[in-house]
């Protein structure tokens, strides 16, 4: 039987111990984790294969199975992400700002760990290691609750991490997992505010809504990517197509994948047939785009209101024709999830206008939305992509897992 009260208390104590460690101590533990991931590859992949088999038996779709899948290459990538975290500067103890006050007090604002973090995620076994490594680097303890789809993978990954922690002389309770699939435990975790300081969900809209509705702990909302790219009439069309192909097809199951393509009306008849020839996906198009794409021989269906709000997580692509940049921004404001949006244009003035008017965590000029990623941003393995404005926004790396404290030093100073 899982006792979250016991887990929370142990995590709180582990967080205190982690907060006192040097960067070298934490990096040594991370090195042990990376080595254990590689030395235990066979066992990890065998456990993951069980999850994949069960997912197929249960009829899960290809997008979920892709997120669930671990391969030797992906596992090596996860281990290398841990090593990259080692190479990053430790933000804990960093001076943010400070100065001498009129009272004579020396006032400093320094970065400190958040404390205990709860992470709830679905078919993403890589999150187990990503979150554990970032939390350890920043001196935070973590309680993980993965989806039932990943139970075999998560169990062995947490064992690997805990064994590495013990080898490094650190409390294994710094990284704990809820392995019981009982959903009541999720609700209990969301209300464990006596011990847990922050909840980070990683999954679909339903999971985020559940956490937001029931948590008595601050929740980081994000990761739902209804991402747009607007092709403005001055764009280099051939180069624009290469960006669109990358944004849509490189890895369709990710949250930074392009879901809706906005085309300026003045170039639609010229551009869309070129796109259809280069990008053979299933299109969901508005009336005018449907006619053009159908005539070009593309596989196309009529787009619906629900489609425009959908995170496809596959190669389906919405196409909407807009009159100008004003209409493009209005569409994004109505249907976007404040994740990642892009404009393809040769106009610096319009690019600046797009950046100023689009209120998303990441806004791109002449680049793919696929770059919204902690590794690509140089942050290391991300814990999440936040689409809210507090406490963090965009890919959440190390600094997003810290808070700060004010430290005032005086000479027996009293307030007058």
From Swiss-Prot:
Subcellular location per the Swiss-Prot or TrEMBL entry: Cytoplasm
This protein's UniProt keywords: Amino-acid biosynthesis, Cytoplasm, NADP, Oxidoreductase, Proline biosynthesis
Superkingdom per UniProt: Bacteria
Tagged with keyword Amino-acid biosynthesis: yes
Catalytic activity: L-glutamate 5-semialdehyde + phosphate + NADP(+) = L-glutamyl 5-phosphate + NADPH + H(+)
Signal peptide: none
Pathway annotation: Amino-acid biosynthesis; L-proline biosynthesis; L-glutamate 5-semialdehyde from L-glutamate: step 2/2
Pfam families membership: Aldedh (PF00171)
Documented EC number(s): 1.2.1.41
Any single Gene Ontology cellular-component annotation: cytoplasm
GO BP, sorted A to Z: L-proline biosynthetic process
InterPro entries: Ald_DH/histidinol_DH, Ald_DH_C, Ald_DH_N, Aldehyde_DH_dom, G-glutamylP_reductase_CS, Glu-5-SA_DH, GPR_dom
PROSITE patterns given in the database record: PROA (PS01223)
Listed GO MF terms: glutamate-5-semialdehyde dehydrogenase activity; NADP binding
Primary residence: cytoplasm
Protein family (similarity comment): Belongs to the gamma-glutamyl phosphate reductase family.
Function noted in UniProt: Catalyzes the NADPH-dependent reduction of L-glutamate 5-phosphate into L-glutamate 5-semialdehyde and phosphate. The product spontaneously undergoes cyclization to form 1-pyrroline-5-carboxylate.
Protein name: Gamma-glutamyl phosphate reductase
Protein source organism: Actinobacillus succinogenes (strain ATCC 55618 / DSM 22257 / CCUG 43843 / 130Z)
Gene responsible for this protein: proA
């Amino acid at each position: 039987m899982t006792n979250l009260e016991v887990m929370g208390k142990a995590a709180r104590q582990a967080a205190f111990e982690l907060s006192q460690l040097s960067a070298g101590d934490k990096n040594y533990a991370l090195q042990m984790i990376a080595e254990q991931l590689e030395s235990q590859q066979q066992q990890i992949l065998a456990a993951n294969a069980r999850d994949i088999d069960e997912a197929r038996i249960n009829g899960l779709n290809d997008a979920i199975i892709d997120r669930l899948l671990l391969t030797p290459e992906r596992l090596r990538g996860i281990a290398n992400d841990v090593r990259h975290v080692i190479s990053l500067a430790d933000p804990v103890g960093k001076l943010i700002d400070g100065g001498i006050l009129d009272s004579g007090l020396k006032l400093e604002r320094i970065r400190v760990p958040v404390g205990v973090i709860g992470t709830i995620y679905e078919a993403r076994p890589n999150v187990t290691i990503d979150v554990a490594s970032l939390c350890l680097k920043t001196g935070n303890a973590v309680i993980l609750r993965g989806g039932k789809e990943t139970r075999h993978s998560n169990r062995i990954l947490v064992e690997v991490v805990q064994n590495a922690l013990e080898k490094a002389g650190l409390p294994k309770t710094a990284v704990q997992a809820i392995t019981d699939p009982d959903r009541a435990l999720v609700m209990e975790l969301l209300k464990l505010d006596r011990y847990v300081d922050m909840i980070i969900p990683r999954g679909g809209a339903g999971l985020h809504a559940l956490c937001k509705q029931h948590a008595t702990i601050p929740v980081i909302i994000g990761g739902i990517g209804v991402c747009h790219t607007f092709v403005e009439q001055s764009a280099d069309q051939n180069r624009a197509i290469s960006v669109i192909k990358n944004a849509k097809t490189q890895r369709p199951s990710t949250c930074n994948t392009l879901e809706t393509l906005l085309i300026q009306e003045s170039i639609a008849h010229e551009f869309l047939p070129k796109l259809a020839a280069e990008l053979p996906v299933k299109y969901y198009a508005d009336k005018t785009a449907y006619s053009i794409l159908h005539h070009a021989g593309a596989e196309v269906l009529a787009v619906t209101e629900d489609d425009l709000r959908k995170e496809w997580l596959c190669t389906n692509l919405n196409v909407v024709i807009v009159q100008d940049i004003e209409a493009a921004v209005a569409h994004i404001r109505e249907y976007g999830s404040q994740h990642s949006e892009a404009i393809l244009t040769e106009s610096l003035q319009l690019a600046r206008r797009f950046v100023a008017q689009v209120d998303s965590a990441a806004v791109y000029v002449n680049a793919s939305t696929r770059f919204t990623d902690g590794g690509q941003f140089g942050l290391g393995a991300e814990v999440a992509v936040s689409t809210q404005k507090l406490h963090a926004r965009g890919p959440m790396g190390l600094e997003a897992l810290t808070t700060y404290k004010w430290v005032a030093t005086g000479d027996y100073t009293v307030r007058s």
